[in-house]
């Protein structure tokens, strides 16, 4: 039987999400500027750094609540994937920092909660599981390279692999269950 590793759910803030990526949204600690058009009615938030050197896809996903257990973690080498909520529902993202190893560092895995008013843009190579809906179904825009979609069809030993993707089955690789807990860290 596999061991269980609990991941306390941390509130996503610009500071604690920084090793993994950036928050995307208004009032998230980013500088703003006004455009000289539209009588200053448009305020622009400094944009996060999105990277993609090829055909990029915007998909809309409906994520229904599921068990708060990490099955897969994946990373991308050629683009910075983003998740942008559409319907204001809270969600969680599980991440591990980028690194040279073929697998994520389980001691560095973190779970973050998002209030549904901001998105998340990952750093290049950040390990992650697909977002978890925390209450109602979550509608979100997923921005990624089309090559990644093709890589998801390249299965080797039950995992997806490609030039822009490593998708690893955490339970099989580590004999562990990563479980998100709703109690805060330090509680």
Segments (PLM) and residue ranges:
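A short pocket-lining beta-strand/turn micro-motif at the edge of beta-sheets
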Residues: 110, 118, 136-139
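Conserved metal-binding segment of the jelly-roll/cupin
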Residues: 113-127
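His/acidic/aromatic-lined binding-pocket segments of jelly-roll/cupin-type domains
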Residues: 81-84, 119-120, 131
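Non-catalytic, conserved peripheral segments adjacent to functional cores
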Residues: 1-111, 149-187
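A short beta-strand-loop micro-motif that forms or neighbors metal/cofactor-
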Residues: 126-159
């Amino acid at each position: 039987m596999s061991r269980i590793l609990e991941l306390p759910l941390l509130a996503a803030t610009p500071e604690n999400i920084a090793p993994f990526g950036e928050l995307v949204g208004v009032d998230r600690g980013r500088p703003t500027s006004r455009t000289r058009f539209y009588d200053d009615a448009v305020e622009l938030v400094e944009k996060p750094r999105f990277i993609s050197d090829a055909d990029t896809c915007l998909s809309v996903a409906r994520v229904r609540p599921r068990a708060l257990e990490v099955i897969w973690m994946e990373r991308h080498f050629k683009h910075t994937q983003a998740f942008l909520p559409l319907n204001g529902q809270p969600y969680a993202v599980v991440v591990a920092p980028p690194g040279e190893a073929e697998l994520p560092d389980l001691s560095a895995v973190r779970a973050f909660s998002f209030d549904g008013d901001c998105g998340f843009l990952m750093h290049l190579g950040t390990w992650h599981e697909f977002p978890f809906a925390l209450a109602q179904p979550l509608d979100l825009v997923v921005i990624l390279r089309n090559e990644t979609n093709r890589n998801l069809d390249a299965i080797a030993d039950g995992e997806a692999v490609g030039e822009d993707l490593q998708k690893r089955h955490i339970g099989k690789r580590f004999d562990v269950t990563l479980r998100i807990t709703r109690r805060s860290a330090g509680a």
